[in-house]
A protein has these predicted regions:
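Membrane-embedded and juxtamembrane structural elements of multi-pass membrane proteins
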Residues: 1-272
Length: 272
C-alpha cells in the first residue's frame, strides 16, 4: 500500500495547495478528511486476498529473502511514536509548572461570550512566550507570565483565539493528523498536509473572530503584541509558530485574500 498512499497523498497535497493559495482559511476539516483516508488505507492490507496459481514451465519458484522495508517502517514508527509520548509527558510537566488562573474575569467573560459550557482551565506558565492550548478531555489554555502586562483588549483577543480552538475541536483533529504522520512518517506529503492543517486552524480562528465583529486592525495589533515565535508540542496549538505573523496580518487586512504590495506595506506600518 506504500505506492498508492504516496500517489494519493501527493495528489491530495497538490489539490490542497491550490485551495490554500486561493483561501488560507479553507475549512481544516477537508484536510483532516484526507488524512483520515490515509489512516484507513493501511487497513486494506487486512482484507482477504485471492491468488490464482498458474501452472506452466516456469519451474520451481525460489523463496525470496524477507524484505527489510517492514523493519525500517517499524523503526520509524517507534521513533516518532516515542516522540509523541514524550510530548504528552511534557504537557503533564507544563501542568505542574504552571499556576491556575480560572478566576481571571476576562477568562470568564470570554467563556460566556463563546457559550462554552465544558470545563476549560486557564493556567499561567513562567517559561512560555506565547499562548498555547492543549488537552483533549480537559482543555487547558497556557498564557505566558508576561500576559499580566497585556492590555485588557490584547488579553481578550488571545483568550478568544485559544478558546476558538477548543470550540472548533481543533485539538482532536490535530491529534488525528499527528497519528497519521506517525504511521506515514516516510511520506513528506503527509507531513506537509499536517502543517497545512495547523496553518488552516490558525487562519480559521482569525477569520472567525473577524466575522464575529472583531475589528481586523485591533486584532492585528493584538497579534503583534502577543505572537512571539513559540515551540509547542505536536499535540497542542500555539497562537504563534505555525503561520508567519506577517502572512496572518496580510490575510486579515485583505479580507481573506492574498495580499498585494500595498497591503504588505500596510502590515509593516501596523506591526510597527
Amino acid at each position: 500500500m506504500i505506492i498508492p498512499s504516496l500517489v494519493f497523498s501527493l495528489l491530495a497535497a497538490f489539490a490542497m495547495w491550490v485551495f490554500v493559495r486561493r483561501n488560507p482559511a479553507t475549512d481544516p476539516r477537508v484536510t483532516v478528511a484526507i488524512l483520515a483516508l490515509l489512516l484507513i488505507l493501511p487497513l486494506l492490507n487486512f482484507l482477504p486476498k485471492y491468488s490464482v496459481s498458474v501452472e506452466g514451465s516456469l519451474g520451481t519458484s525460489t523463496s525470496l529473502s524477507p524484505s527489510i522495508l517492514p523493519s525500517i517502517w517499524t523503526l520509524g514508527f517507534l521513533f516518532f511514536g516515542l516522540r509523541g509520548l514524550i510530548d504528552v509527558l511534557s504537557m503533564q510537566r507544563w501542568n505542574r509548572e504552571s499556576r491556575l488562573a480560572n478566576d481571571l474575569p476576562a477568562f470568564q467573560e470570554t467563556l460566556c461570550e463563546l457559550a462554552i459550557s465544558r470545563r476549560v482551565d486557564l493556567r499561567i506558565h513562567p517559561r512560555l512566550t506565547s499562548p498555547v492550548v492543549s488537552g483533549l478531555i480537559r482543555p487547558r489554555i497556557y498564557l505566558p507570565e508576561s500576559s499580566t502586562d497585556w492590555s485588557p483588549q490584547t488579553l481578550r483577543m488571545a483568550l478568544l483565539h485559544e478558546l476558538g480552538h477548543v470550540q472548533r475541536r481543533d485539538l482532536w483533529m490535530a491529534t488525528l493528523a499527528h497519528i497519521v504522520c506517525v504511521l506515514h512518517w516516510f511520506n513528506p506529503s503527509v507531513w506537509w498536509l499536517r502543517r497545512t492543517f495547523l496553518s488552516q486552524c490558525e487562519y480559521a480562528c482569525d477569520a472567525h473572530l473577524v466575522e464575529k465583529g472583531t475589528d481586523p486592525n485591533i486584532y492585528a495589533n493584538a497579534l503583534c503584541d502577543v505572537a512571539q515565535s513559540a515551540s509547542a508540542p505536536p499535540l497542542s496549538l500555539a497562537m504563534a509558530g505555525h503561520v508567519p505573523l506577517r502572512e496572518r496580518i496580510i490575510f486579515l487586512s485583505s479580507g481573506g485574500r492574498r495580499g498585494s504590495a500595498f497591503l504588505s506595506s500596510l502590515i509593516f506600518l501596523t506591526a510597527s
